[in-house]
Amino acid sequence: MHVKKGDTVKVISGKDKGKQGVILEAYPKKDRVLVEGVNIVKKHAKPSQENPQGGILNMEAPIHVSNVLPIDPKTGEPTRVGYKVENGKKVRIAKKSGEVLDK
Protein backbone atom coordinates (compact mmCIF):
# COMPACT_ATOMS: atom_id res chain seq x y z
CA MET A 1 0.00 0.00 0.00
CA HIS A 2 1.20 3.50 -0.79
CA VAL A 3 0.01 5.00 2.52
CA LYS A 4 0.65 4.13 6.17
CA LYS A 5 -0.86 4.82 9.57
CA GLY A 6 -0.12 8.42 10.58
CA ASP A 7 0.10 9.79 7.00
CA THR A 8 -1.86 12.95 6.19
CA VAL A 9 -3.96 12.21 3.12
CA LYS A 10 -6.49 13.91 0.84
CA VAL A 11 -9.59 12.10 -0.44
CA ILE A 12 -9.65 12.29 -4.25
CA SER A 13 -12.99 10.60 -5.00
CA GLY A 14 -16.26 9.63 -3.38
CA LYS A 15 -18.72 11.53 -1.22
CA ASP A 16 -15.94 13.05 0.90
CA LYS A 17 -13.84 14.24 -2.06
CA GLY A 18 -11.52 17.11 -1.10
CA LYS A 19 -11.38 16.36 2.63
CA GLN A 20 -8.05 15.89 4.41
CA GLY A 21 -7.31 13.73 7.42
CA VAL A 22 -4.80 11.51 9.17
CA ILE A 23 -4.86 7.75 8.68
CA LEU A 24 -5.92 6.14 11.97
CA GLU A 25 -5.71 2.51 10.83
CA ALA A 26 -4.70 0.62 7.69
CA TYR A 27 -6.17 -2.71 6.56
CA PRO A 28 -3.72 -4.03 3.93
CA LYS A 29 -5.58 -7.33 3.33
CA LYS A 30 -8.73 -5.43 2.40
CA ASP A 31 -6.90 -2.48 0.72
CA ARG A 32 -8.76 -0.04 2.97
CA VAL A 33 -7.80 2.78 5.35
CA LEU A 34 -9.61 4.53 8.19
CA VAL A 35 -9.21 8.31 7.80
CA GLU A 36 -9.99 10.74 10.63
CA GLY A 37 -13.19 12.71 9.97
CA VAL A 38 -13.91 11.04 6.61
CA ASN A 39 -16.75 8.66 5.60
CA ILE A 40 -18.82 9.22 8.74
CA VAL A 41 -21.58 6.60 9.11
CA LYS A 42 -24.32 6.07 11.68
CA LYS A 43 -24.00 2.84 13.68
CA HIS A 44 -26.91 1.50 15.70
CA ALA A 45 -25.53 0.25 19.03
CA LYS A 46 -27.31 -1.99 21.52
CA PRO A 47 -27.04 -0.99 25.17
CA SER A 48 -23.87 -2.50 26.68
CA GLN A 49 -21.53 -2.08 29.67
CA GLU A 50 -19.53 0.69 27.96
CA ASN A 51 -22.61 2.35 26.44
CA PRO A 52 -25.60 1.72 28.74
CA GLN A 53 -27.76 4.16 26.74
CA GLY A 54 -27.25 2.48 23.35
CA GLY A 55 -28.62 4.43 20.39
CA ILE A 56 -27.14 5.78 17.18
CA LEU A 57 -23.41 6.59 17.08
CA ASN A 58 -21.49 8.52 14.42
CA MET A 59 -18.21 6.84 13.49
CA GLU A 60 -15.68 6.65 10.66
CA ALA A 61 -15.83 3.75 8.21
CA PRO A 62 -12.87 2.54 6.12
CA ILE A 63 -12.50 3.75 2.52
CA HIS A 64 -10.60 2.14 -0.34
CA VAL A 65 -6.91 3.06 -0.49
CA SER A 66 -7.21 4.06 -4.17
CA ASN A 67 -9.42 7.00 -3.11
CA VAL A 68 -6.68 8.74 -1.10
CA LEU A 69 -3.37 10.42 -1.94
CA PRO A 70 -0.70 11.40 0.60
CA ILE A 71 0.04 15.10 1.11
CA ASP A 72 3.50 16.23 -0.05
CA PRO A 73 5.33 17.64 3.02
CA LYS A 74 7.12 20.25 0.88
CA THR A 75 4.24 21.63 -1.24
CA GLY A 76 1.19 20.66 0.83
CA GLU A 77 -0.51 19.20 -2.25
CA PRO A 78 -1.62 15.61 -2.93
CA THR A 79 1.07 13.58 -4.67
CA ARG A 80 1.63 10.13 -6.08
CA VAL A 81 4.17 7.88 -4.38
CA GLY A 82 7.46 6.59 -5.71
CA TYR A 83 10.02 4.32 -4.09
CA LYS A 84 13.78 4.70 -3.74
CA VAL A 85 16.50 2.74 -1.94
CA GLU A 86 18.48 4.88 0.52
CA ASN A 87 21.15 3.34 2.78
CA GLY A 88 19.86 -0.15 1.96
CA LYS A 89 16.28 0.73 2.99
CA LYS A 90 13.30 1.19 0.67
CA VAL A 91 11.70 4.60 1.32
CA ARG A 92 8.62 6.30 -0.10
CA ILE A 93 9.15 9.56 -1.97
CA ALA A 94 6.70 12.20 -3.21
CA LYS A 95 6.59 12.25 -7.02
CA LYS A 96 5.92 16.03 -7.14
CA SER A 97 8.88 17.22 -5.05
CA GLY A 98 11.10 14.18 -4.52
CA GLU A 99 10.74 14.67 -0.75
CA VAL A 100 10.95 11.54 1.47
CA LEU A 101 7.52 10.64 2.94
CA ASP A 102 8.82 8.22 5.59
CA LYS A 103 9.85 9.83 8.85
Curated annotation (Swiss-Prot):
GO biological process, alphabetically ordered: translation
Assigned keywords, A-Z: Ribonucleoprotein, Ribosomal protein, RNA-binding, rRNA-binding
The UniProt record lists the keyword Cell wall biogenesis/degradation: no
Record's keyword annotation contains Chloroplast: no
Family label: Belongs to the universal ribosomal protein uL24 family.
Quaternary assembly: Part of the 50S ribosomal subunit.
Protein name as it appears in the record: Large ribosomal subunit protein uL24
Organism encoding this protein: Halalkalibacterium halodurans (strain ATCC BAA-125 / DSM 18197 / FERM 7344 / JCM 9153 / C-125) (Bacillus halodurans)
Lineage: Bacteria, Bacillati, Bacillota, Bacilli, Bacillales
